[in-house]
Swiss-Prot record:
Comment text on domains: This protein is mostly composed of repetitive C-G-P motifs.
Protein's organism: Drosophila melanogaster (Fruit fly)
Keywords: Developmental protein, Differentiation, Repeat, Spermatogenesis
The protein's name in its UniProt record: Male-specific sperm protein Mst84Db
Keyword Repeat: yes
Length: 74
């Protein structure tokens, strides 16, 4: 579990960068804070930005989730 971009914890998606694979990286504001988007609870959405936090599990996507659409099928 990692800290997501909106300050809640959820399943982490693989990504590069400072968090490595975004494994168990502790509380919000620690390892995962620079990793933000990759730790959003959207599964394998890739780097879709903080708005991805509103996608849930790649489910219904509002306008804010536009960057997730290629990954979430929205």
């Amino acid at each position: 579990m990692c800290c997501g971009p909106l300050g809640f914890c959820g399943p982490c998606s693989p990504c590069g960068g400072p968090c490595g694979p975004c494994g168990p990286c502790g509380p919000c504001g620690s390892c995962c804070s620079p990793c933000g988007s990759c730790c959003a609870p959207c599964g394998p959405c890739g780097p879709c930005g903080p708005c991805c936090g509103g996608c849930g599990p790649c489910g219904p996507c509002g306008p804010c989730c536009g960057p997730c659409r290629p990954y979430c099928g929205c």
